[in-house]
Amino acid sequence: MSQQPPAVGVPPSHAYPAEGPPKDAYPPPGQPYPQQGYPPPQGYPQQGYPPQGYPPQGYPEQGYPQQGYPPQQQQQQKHSPGMLEGCIAALCCYCVLDACF
């Protein structure tokens, strides 16, 4: 008992879905979405998380240094060759090598 494939150009009968939402859609058609729990229930923040707000009095003196801006680095006093001086040196080397060969 072998089935013959349909002729070329004929769409199968089960190719397109039925009109309307799927049968297993959530929520079922005609019913609203369930109410969400907002605002969060009492007892928030959850156990294990500290409450939000200002730090307690004396917080910086508990062994941690107070944070601030890092110290600025002083500019180097040595004069390093600039890009222009490097390009001139490379051009001179090119001219010398071109004249030699």
Curated annotation (Swiss-Prot):
Residues 1-80 are annotated as: Disordered. It comes from Arabidopsis thaliana. This is Cysteine-rich and transmembrane domain-containing protein B. It comes from the Eukaryota. The keyword Membrane applies. GO terms for cellular component: membrane. Belongs to the CYSTM1 family. The keyword Transmembrane applies. The chain crosses the membrane at residues 78-95. It is a single-pass membrane protein. Residues 24-43 have a biased composition (Pro residues). Residues 59-77 have a biased composition (Low complexity). Keywords: Membrane, Transmembrane, Transmembrane helix. It is found in: Membrane.
